[in-house]
Amino acid sequence: MASLDSLVIFLFSTLFVTIVSSETPCPNFKSIISFGDSIADTGNLVGLSDRNQLPVTAFPPYGETFFHHPTGRSCDGRIIMDFIAEFVGLPYVPPYFGSKNRNFDKGVNFAVAGATALKSSFLKKRGIQPHTNVSLGVQLKSFKKSLPNLCGSPSDCRDMIGNALILMGEIGGNDYNFPFFNRKPVKEVEELVPFVIASISSTITELIGMGGKTFLVPGEFPIGCSVVYLTLYKTSNKDEYDPSTGCLKWLNKFGEYHSEKLKVELNRLRKLYPHVNIIYADYYNSLLRIFKEPAKFGFMERPFPACCGIGGPYNFNFTRKCGSVGVKSCKDPSKYVGWDGVHMTEAAYKWIADGILNGPYANPPFDRSCLRSEIKKESLYNQSTLTQACVKL
């Protein structure tokens, strides 16, 4: 009987791919606290910008698919964090900067497009010019300053942070993008990786000290598949490309390098803080599977041009980007993986989010028992639909 019980438990956990260690906390998340860059920005860069110098994300066709107007998201619609919010039954997370009379009871977002993990002064000393001074450290300081308004007393704030799902990015991508855009040697950019990882780790550690119990920490994307890099580093040497994806192999190897170093550091933190649930989100492989089998996920075949752009083999031009006058989007963004040459479409982000939330691209997997019953039913229905129909959710 004991062996039969064990088998049943094993099969149950395998079917739903959601069981985490019994030592980890299992809250019904009451809010989402977010840090990061454009992958998670829901309007902060727009909020921080001069009204006469707004970023392209403040203009159509950004936001056309779901919100039907620009929201400051670097996407045609929802981003990964929006699908995470839906999954845990919370509202979309509002941006903190530039917000007036916003309700942050269910979440607050400090992610800013262009943000780096490292201080701007650190990068400038190395000849790297970031587009914003709002680094991860600045975001954390802003969060601390906001606490009296968000939660009141220290004990209330500790409870709030402890009951939140804390999303750590993606962050660090811009620390690498800026030097790569200037064609810095890969070995030189690799030297930044330990510093980027240390910045992410120290921020997590500080938030744990403030009461944080559940963290979702994404790795790097397969940047060799990004339209901006395929355009910038276009070459006639076919050996530079992965024949299974059409992506630049050396850039993808760099993305893997960052992600592997991050996973090592997260394992170290787990040993130091066994009461904290630190979930690694494998953005790399959750997206790479789409490039390997685009038709399976409802996307057009290679060469994976940007939906919104103009010119060149990938529909991308550095001087006339999406959101600029005269630059239009494609008729059906759901058939495209890439949105504007740098970021993905809502359709691609939904698949990435599904890979994280429903498996197998989160370690440890999300614990479905943490979700309210109505959310569980909806997620299971969506997962079943996705598996049976194999169409875009």
Curated annotation (Swiss-Prot):
InterPro entries: GDSL (IPR001087), SGNH_hydro_sf (IPR036514), SGNH_plant_lipase-like (IPR035669)
Enzyme Commission code: 3.1.1.-
BP-aspect Gene Ontology terms: lipid catabolic process
Secreted found in the keyword field: yes
GO MF term set: hydrolase activity, acting on ester bonds
Recorded GO CC terms: extracellular region
Residues of the signal peptide: 1-22
Main location: secreted
Subcellular locations according to the entry: Secreted
Glycosylated residues (UniProt): 133, 317, 382
Active site (record annotation): 38 (nucleophile), 340, 343
Key words, A-Z: Glycoprotein, Hydrolase, Lipid degradation, Lipid metabolism, Secreted, Signal
Family: Belongs to the 'GDSL' lipolytic enzyme family.
Protein name according to UniProt: GDSL esterase/lipase At1g28600
UniProt source species: Arabidopsis thaliana (Mouse-ear cress)
Source taxonomy: Eukaryota, Viridiplantae, Streptophyta, Embryophyta, Tracheophyta
